[in-house]
């Protein structure tokens, strides 16, 4: 079955809707999406195929995405610069947490069929390294989202009340941040759960004990992926809001 026409129609409709509603920002976000895909497919994937260090490559790819995208979409200003610094800092922290989680849980990434094929046909590529890089890149989107939101919040609070004490601004910004964290945490989990719905059905009809299923390689991978993203999200909101105060 040839799906080319259908796929292009849906992509075109999505692009048109983004441009109509987002206007200039919508166009810039699409350019940013192109930069993101170019960084991942043009740099990260070939470098991983050559057996490069997954942590260093994922962080480098993340920086290569953030530098142009943040300034392109949000402009060259204090908000973008501070969000960039906060996101990069928290991304490095997320990389450390992901590395610790994978090593302590002894994840091998072999519960996924694609990873098994990579292990079979591309022995020079580290499956665990791919897993780690995936954790880091996966956390990047939510980190960028929360740092930009908190930067905008702090900026608006100071503009509305320039004489406010830093701690007052921090408390007010964190009230907004808590709402954002609450929505983003379950959004993050639901995004992963949606992709793993067939697996969830298989687990529900399995005769294996629940804890044995939850600690299997494939399920533990998704659980830890969501957990690392959620922890990094909370740390980003708290630390970044504090760092932006004068």
Give the predicted meaning of each segment.
Residues 95-219:
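Generic detector of multi-pass transmembrane helix bundles and their immediately adjacent loops
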Residues 2-3, 50, 54, 176-187, ...:
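Loop-to-transmembrane-helix entry motif
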Residues 208-240:
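Internal helix-turn-beta structural module
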Residues 1-9:
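Extracytoplasmic
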Residues 9-118, 128-138:
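Transmembrane alpha-helical segments that form the functional core of multipass membrane systems
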Residues 241-246:
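Conserved small/polar residues in nucleotide/adenosyl-binding loops
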């Amino acid at each position: 079955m040839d799906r080319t026409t259908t796929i292009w129609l849906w992509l075109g409709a999505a692009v048109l809707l983004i441009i109509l509603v987002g206007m200039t920002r919508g166009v810039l976000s699409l350019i940013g999406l192109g930069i993101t895909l170019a960084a991942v497919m043009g740099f990260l994937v070939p470098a991983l195929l050559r057996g490069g260090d997954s942590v260093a490559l994922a962080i480098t790819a993340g920086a290569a995405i953030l530098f142009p995208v943040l300034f392109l979409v949000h402009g060259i200003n204090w908000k973008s610069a501070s969000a960039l610094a906060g996101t990069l800092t928290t991304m490095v922290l997320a990389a450390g947490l992901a590395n610790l989680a994978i090593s302590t849980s002894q994840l091998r990434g072999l519960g996924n069929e694609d990873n098994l094929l990579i292990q079979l046909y591309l022995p020079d590529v580290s499956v665990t390294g791919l897993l780690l890089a995936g954790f880091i890149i996966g956390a990047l989107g939510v980190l960028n989202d929360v740092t930009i939101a908190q930067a905008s919040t702090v900026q608006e609070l100071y503009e509305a009340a320039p004489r406010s004490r830093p701690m007052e601004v921090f408390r007010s910004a964190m009230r907004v941040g808590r709402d954002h964290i609450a929505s983003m945490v379950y959004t993050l989990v639901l995004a992963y759960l949606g992709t793993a719905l067939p697996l969830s059905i298989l687990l529900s009809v399995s005769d294996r004990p629940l804890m044995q299923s939850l600690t299997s390689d494939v399920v533990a991978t998704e659980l830890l992926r969501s957990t690392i993203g959620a922890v990094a999200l909370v740390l980003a909101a708290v630390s970044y809001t504090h760092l932006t105060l004068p």
